[in-house]
Amino acid sequence: MYVLTSPVGDYFKSGAKPLRLLLEEDGMRCAPHMGMIKSGGNYASALGPILRARKECDADQILFCPNGDVQETGAANFILIDGNEIITKALDSSFLHGITRDSILTLARDMGMTVTERNFTVDELIERAKKPGTEAALSGTAAVLTSVGTLI
């Protein structure tokens, strides 16, 4: 077995600074039944909306929420942390089943946190985000665990 390593920079240009996410209720990262397939086409389809969000809203990423259903960004899973509970979308074919996401949820359960995998809406996200102590993060191979500071 060989292990190859190479230095890389931060995935997001903001580095350790919390991200600004634009909530996008009209578009999707990819076709609904193709979300769990890790392919270049699925990432590429999100690039145009992400570039527009950066230019027009100074957003770091887009959180795709078709019809108000919170899903994922162009390259990472979304996690909401409300006190001792982690809420994230239930696994289905509309988004990528991230290994980093699974690892984080396993560690959270092992630490005694409540992990809730279910659909949740933009309205619920905004309502919970108003509560003191509520946090949000993106998880992914490149993103690792990156904090979200602002929802636009």
Regions found by a protein language model. Give the residues of each.
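Helix-start/capping segments and mature chain N-termini
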Residues: 2-152
